[in-house]
């Protein structure tokens, strides 16, 4: 029986693509999962796959802190090596992040092949440092391939959960009416700056008949500040495929996972890159979508609500005013998103894994 270790941890951007690949594997394969304690995977993974957790962190600190992190990495690598041998793992698949480092190093130690998936336009630290130890580095965006040394990079796109790839109903709790639907994705941790920016731009849209679903995340202190019958605020939704498939427009950060979900749904989007993202990778992700005409970029700054309000007026104003003769700028944006989408990304990654699974014997 082929035995695969999936190392994916932390955020949905790392976890959901890995789960999509796991769902697409042949039924005969056995999957073990490597994660970090107290992260999202402890909620999503155990009901489907055997989960092992190890402490892992980055190497961004200095002095004593960096030394502690290095010792932690060495300890984690030793634990993963024991896991690989105990479970008879033949291949490792990882989506990057902190957990990828001990997984790649332990696999290298044991002579086990690794497929690393990098979803962002600018490769992360682990990809840059440890990609050389992997048999294949799969990338979600073609521009990232140019930043991968050697000839290991293969463009596969970033996998999305299967529900995004088939028609889904509009959730029943979405505000009723004929107005266009705007979906705001604030982020799982609550992007407070983005949420405040959105609330500053919404009142005129709501009064004009626009329906708005605002997914605020868990840590937004201003929930309930704006009250309107056309507005629904929720921390998150398990019905994202239905929301995005039926949305006329979305507002989102520019994480690679979110961008892939928006792309397969063909959802025109205003992207607001997270200003503190490592290496400004969200700026680069957003630029890829904007270059195809799929998205408009609005930056978070002192006059953010005015910039966002202007973009919303440009994209939705004519429809809200009932001007049927005006051209709809959302149509070419939808076409651009469809060009960005790679609907078979999960299958492409499985195809890369199949010839390697025997190489780890």
UniProtKB/Swiss-Prot annotation:
Reaction catalysed by this enzyme: di-trans,octa-cis-undecaprenyl diphospho-N-acetyl-alpha-D-muramoyl-L-alanyl-D-glutamyl-meso-2,6-diaminopimeloyl-D-alanyl-D-alanine + UDP-N-acetyl-alpha-D-glucosamine = di-trans,octa-cis-undecaprenyl diphospho-[N-acetyl-alpha-D-glucosaminyl-(1->4)]-N-acetyl-alpha-D-muramoyl-L-alanyl-D-glutamyl-meso-2,6-diaminopimeloyl-D-alanyl-D-alanine + UDP + H(+)
Compartments (UniProt record): Cell inner membrane
Annotated organism of origin: Prochlorococcus marinus (strain MIT 9303)
Pathway: Cell wall biogenesis; peptidoglycan biosynthesis
Membrane topology: Peripheral membrane protein
Binding site for UDP-N-acetyl-alpha-D-glucosamine: 11-13, 120, 161, 188, 282
Protein name per its UniProtKB record: UDP-N-acetylglucosamine--N-acetylmuramyl-(pentapeptide) pyrophosphoryl-undecaprenol N-acetylglucosamine transferase
Transmembrane segments: none
InterPro entries: GlcNAc_MurG, Glyco_trans_28_C, GlycoTrans_28_N
EC number in record: 2.4.1.227
GO biological process: carbohydrate metabolic process; cell division; cell wall organization; lipid glycosylation; peptidoglycan biosynthetic process; regulation of cell shape
Domain of life where this protein originates: Bacteria
MF (Gene Ontology): UDP-N-acetyl-D-glucosamine:N-acetylmuramoyl-L-alanyl-D-glutamyl-meso-2,6-diaminopimelyl-D-alanyl-D-alanine-diphosphoundecaprenol 4-beta-N-acetylglucosaminlytransferase activity; undecaprenyldiphospho-muramoylpentapeptide beta-N-acetylglucosaminyltransferase activity
A GO cellular component annotation in the UniProt record: plasma membrane
Alphabetic keyword roster: Cell cycle, Cell division, Cell inner membrane, Cell membrane, Cell shape, Cell wall biogenesis/degradation, Glycosyltransferase, Membrane, Peptidoglycan synthesis, Transferase
EC class of the enzyme, as a word: transferase
Function: Cell wall formation. Catalyzes the transfer of a GlcNAc subunit on undecaprenyl-pyrophosphoryl-MurNAc-pentapeptide (lipid intermediate I) to form undecaprenyl-pyrophosphoryl-MurNAc-(pentapeptide)GlcNAc (lipid intermediate II).
Family to which this protein belongs: Belongs to the glycosyltransferase 28 family. MurG subfamily.
């Amino acid at each position: 029986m082929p035995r695969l270790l999936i190392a994916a941890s932390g955020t949905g951007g790392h976890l959901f693509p890995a789960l999509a690949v796991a769902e697409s594997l042949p039924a005969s394969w056995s999957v073990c999962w490597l994660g970090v304690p107290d992260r999202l995977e402890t909620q999503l993974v155990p009901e489907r796959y055997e989960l092992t957790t190890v402490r892992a962190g980055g190497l961004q600190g200095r002095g004593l802190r960096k030394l502690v992190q290095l010792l932690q990495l060495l300890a984690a690598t030793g634990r993963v090596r024991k896991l690989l041998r105990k479970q008879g793992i033949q291949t490792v698949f990882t989506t990057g992040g902190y957990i990828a480092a001990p997984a790649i190093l332990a696999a290298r130690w044991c002579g086990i092949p690794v497929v690393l998936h990098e979803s962002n336009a600018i490769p992360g630290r682990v990809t840059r440092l440890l990609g050389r130890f992997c048999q294949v580095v799969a990338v979600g965006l073609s521009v990232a391939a140019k930043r991968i040394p050697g000839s290991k990079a293969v463009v596969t796109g970033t996998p999305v959960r299967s529900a995004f790839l088939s028609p889904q109903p509009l959730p029943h709790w979405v505000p009723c009416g004929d107005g266009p639907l705007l979906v705001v994705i604030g982020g799982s941790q609550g992007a407070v700056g983005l949420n405040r920016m959105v609330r500053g731009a919404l009142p005129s849209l709501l009064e004009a008949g626009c329906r708005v679903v605002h997914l605020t995340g868990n840590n937004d202190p201003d929930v309930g500040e704006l009250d309107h019958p056309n507005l629904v605020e929720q921390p998150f939704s398990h019905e994202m495929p239905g929301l995005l498939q039926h949305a006329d427009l979305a507002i989102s950060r520019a994480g690679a996972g979110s961008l892939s979900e928006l792309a397969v749904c063909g959802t025109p989007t205003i992207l607001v890159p997270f200003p503190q993202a490592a290496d400004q990778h969200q700026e680069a992700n957003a630029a890829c979508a904007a270059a195809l005409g799929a998205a408009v970029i609005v930056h978070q700054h002192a006059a953010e609500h005015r910039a966002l309000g202007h973009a919303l007026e440009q994209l939705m104003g004519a429809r809200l005013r009932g001007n049927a003769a005006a051209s709809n700028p959302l149509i070419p944006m939808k076409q651009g998103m469809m060009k960005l989408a790679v609907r078979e990304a999960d299958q492409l990654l499985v195809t890369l894994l199949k010839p390697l699974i025997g190489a780890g014997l």
